[in-house]
Design a protein with these regions (language model features):
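Non-transmembrane, aqueous-exposed alpha-helical and coiled segments at domain scale
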Residues: 42-469
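Intrinsic-disorder-associated, low-complexity terminal segments enriched in Asp/Asn/His/Tyr and depleted
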Residues: 2-3, 24, 41
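Short, positively charged and aromatic/hydrophobic N-terminal segments
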Residues: 12-15, 19, 23, 27-38
């Protein structure tokens, strides 16, 4: 109401002042200044009315014009009123300068750079540097970064004993989370870090050791002896060799597969405040060490609603194959609201348009399949589902396009990576994003995360002795 009165008053003033333009230009300038100040005040605040009382809260506008209501003082000024937002669909837990995502327009940028440009022109290690330090590296900076990582790539032999203690049937994500957490015990200097140098050392250590843990986890799953990498190779080349090298065989690099994996890792490197990233920041807000925070993020990523989606895609494709491989039948089931079947790998919670990452990785998937010439009924089913969905008005109108999980699962299948390892590969790509988010949270000295709740349980009850219950 007060704002309406202000508007009416300003409009009245405008009518009077317009008549005086020729007589008093200074008066017009003063009026315009007053108007701008009033509009600025009105646009930078939000009014919340509770039980007839109004409260003003500032609006925060991001560099991409996202607007948020700053309610840090809500409980203090209202006498204890809080908000509730299950799933945090409308809640910003932080301000971040790392990744921008516009789901409506299908836009994804790391530090201002379009994901399309990075996937086409940069390699994974360059993108990791960009995310963690904010700028693309020079040639000298990248060389030093890689050299420092290689120097820290040796994993303590006692970590092998921990790995050996797991049964072969253990899920690789559980193994990876445990091994990552164990690194804290072998690298105590990475826990209580404050300075830029300490954060850098913790960063290059985990970037060096994490690929080894990933490769060991896969080799354990396949029954292959554990190995170390080749420091003469590039970062992703070394990862490939560690995963695929076989005893008594000379390893030969496949450039098509190398390019596809490099792109996949870039596309998965960060995705702003998703479940696992928010977990890393939340755990890190208690000043837990980087590796403990990463271990928690890995566990969050393990969930089938998050990182496990690409594994779910392949399991769905296998189920369709076992049922005869009729893709049209399953497309019809997906459109039937009374059917419990869900088409995995299509649509996205955030992207209301085509997932920009999926456009990129579809090309890589086509290249991989063409190069390997694999005859695989599961991959044929995947291609059939994709083609039908992209031409079916039901899916097109609802923007249910194949997402990055759909195509990444196809590539990993073609590369011979076990289905249970898919989410581990996701974690490998997401590592630099998690590091960047943890580092940003610590450097901005964000408070410990402590969400509120609305209690809906029993009111006070009197205790009864067991004989009277």
């Amino acid at each position: 109401m007060n704002h309406l009165i202000c508007w009416l008053f300003l409009i009245k003033r405008a009518a009077v002042n317009v008549k005086k333009i020729g007589q008093n230009f200074v008066l017009l300038q003063s009026f315009l200044k007053e108007l701008l100040q009033k509009l600025q005040y009105m646009s930078n605040n939000a009014t919340l009315e509770i039980n007839g009382k109004s409260y003003e809260f500032p609006l925060i506008t991001g560099t991409e014009d996202e607007v948020a209501i700053d309610i840090k003082t809500l409980r203090a000024v209202t006498g204890g009123v809080t908000t509730i937002d299950p799933g945090y669909k409308n809640t910003g837990a932080c301000q971040s300068a790392i990744t921008f995502l516009n789901g409506e327009e299908g836009v994804l940028r790391y530090r201002g750079y379009a994901i399309e440009d990075l996937a086409d022109k940069a390699n994974f290690l360059e993108v990791a540097y960009l995310l963690i330090f904010g700028e693309l590296p020079t040639a000298d900076e990248l060389e030093k970064f890689h050299a420092d990582i290689k120097e820290q790539s040796v994993v303590d032999d006692d970590v092998k004993k921990i790995l050996d203690a797991f049964p072969k049937s253990a899920h690789p994500m559980g193994v990876l989370s445990c091994l990552t957490s164990a690194l804290t015990a072998f690298n105590p200097s990475t826990v209580n870090v404050e300075s830029e140098e300490e954060m850098y050392n913790a960063t290059v250590k985990i970037l060096g050791k994490f690929p080894v843990l990933v490769a060991w986890t896969m080799r354990k799953k396949k029954g292959l002896p554990l190995n170390y990498g080749d420091t003469s190779l590039g970062y992703v080349e070394n990862i490939m060799k560690m995963m695929y090298e076989k005893p008594n065989e000379e390893y030969e690099q496949n450039d098509i597969l190398l390019n596809a994996l490099d792109k996949l890792l870039i596309l998965h490197a960060d995705h702003e405040q998703n479940c696992s990233t928010s977990t890393v920041r939340m755990v890190g807000s208690s000043h837990a060490g980087l590796y403990a925070s990463l271990s928690a993020g890995i566990s969050a990523l393990w969930g089938p609603l998050h990182g496990g989606a690409n594994q779910a895609v392949l399991e769905m494709l296998e189920a369709i194959r076992e049922d005869g491989g009729d893709t049209k039948k399953y497309m019809a089931k997906a459109k039937d609201k009374s059917d419990s079947f869900r088409l995995m790998g299509f649509g996205h919670r955030v992207y209301k348009n085509f997932d920009p990452r999926a456009k990129i990785i579809k090309v890589a998937a086509d290249e991989v399949l063409a190069d390997l010439g694999i005859e695989d009924p599961v991959l044929d089913i995947a291609k059939g589902l994709s083609a039908e969905a992209l031409s079916d008005p039901y899916f097109v109108d609802r923007k249910l396009y194949p997402n990055v999980d759909f195509y990444s699962g196809i590539i990993y299948r073609a590369m011979g990576i076990p289905v249970e390892m898919f989410t581990v590969m996701f974690a490998l790509g997401r590592l630099p994003g998690w590091i960047a988010q943890w580092k940003e949270m610590r450097q901005r000295k964000e408070p410990i995360g402590r969400p509120r709740q609305i209690y809906i349980g029993e009111n006070h009850r009197e205790f009864k002795e067991i004989s009277k219950r």
